[in-house]
Amino acid sequence: MKGYLFRLLNHEELSREEMKTILIGITHSEYPNEQITALLTCLQMRGVTVDELLGFRDGILETGVPAVLQADRYIDVVGTGGDRKNTFNISTTACFVIAGAGYKVAKHGNYAATSVSGASNVIQHHGIRFTDDIDKLNRSLNEAGIVYLHAQLFAKAMKFVGPIRKALQFPTIFNLLGHIVNPSQPKCQLLGVANLDQMRLYNNVYQKLGIDYGIVNSIDGYDEISLTGDFKVTTNNYERIFKPQDLGFAIAKPEELVGGATEEEAAQIFDSVLENRALPAQKNIVLANAGFGIQVLEKGQKSIEECIEIARESIDSGAALRTFKKFVELNS
């Protein structure tokens, strides 16, 4: 480790393989906490490179529990979090809309870090039991079209750095990893980011991974398509700034997106969207995010307008709600 630290202090970059070796060494307790703290601090001060991020990703996946799913093409929809907007569970709701439209979804998530209710909170609130049993996971994917992968069951490396991250109290490379360590390694992903720097970083990451992707950012700082103003979308096929009106949506008010003050209130909004009784702004935001997810799955062969209509039909027909009920039945 000492050699790596000296190189970082000299503003050198570490290779993908070196970073993977370091991560595996951390899980084997090869380094004292002081050296790990120094490593994380050096990386944060200089800025993490794509290869350094991918090296830690490789190490987390290698030391974790894999989830080998029996499907060729499925998507994960996730936001980076940390935008401090306390929105309702937009990405998670969009996942069930996408699955209701007949596509496969492998949602990877965790408990809330900066909001009232994260993906795991709202899923668990409905009585779901998290599992890493691959047979149960594949049954859920095949019969409900969607599977939920609770991060803490799979990324075993994270427990080795938990106390250090808590003590540092500033973001580290680990804050950038949660969105690219889905143990099922989906070939499609829709990622919401809170700023354009993150968009550039993950655009390079996904290009190196060779997957189909969409990255979205609302210009006013939401890590998803909020419809509160202009938003930018970057995919394998195009890069464009949209206005809500371009897609036939009214501009949303920030207060219409708030996820409530309690986990119960967040779950009620989640339910109301799937039951097609949500505020128009809440439904529209889910339709927009689900629509861009569907476009990723379709490799950009369908227009975004077509994909949003597919998502709308999933809600209006009750298919999204039926999908969620089947998911609950299989996973409770």
Features from the language model and the residues they span:
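Acidic, glycine/proline-rich low-complexity segments that act as flexible tails and inter-domain linkers
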Residues: M1-T87, A101, V105, A252-L257, ...
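Short glycine/serine/threonine-biased micro-segments
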Residues: L9, V77-T80, T87, K107, ...
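Residues in well-ordered alpha-helical elements
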Residues: E17, E34, D51, D135, ...
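Short amphipathic alpha-helical face segments that pack within enzyme cores
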Residues: A38, T93-V97, I285, N289-F292
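Short loop or secondary-structure boundary microenvironments that flank
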Residues: L43, G109, G192-N195
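Glycine-rich anion-binding loops and their surrounding alpha/beta cores
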Residues: G59-A67, T87, G102, Q124-T131, ...
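Long, low-complexity, intrinsically disordered polar/charged segments
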Residues: A71-V77, C95, A99, P183-C188
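A generic, well-ordered mixed alpha/beta core segment in the N-terminal half of proteins
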Residues: G79, D83-S140
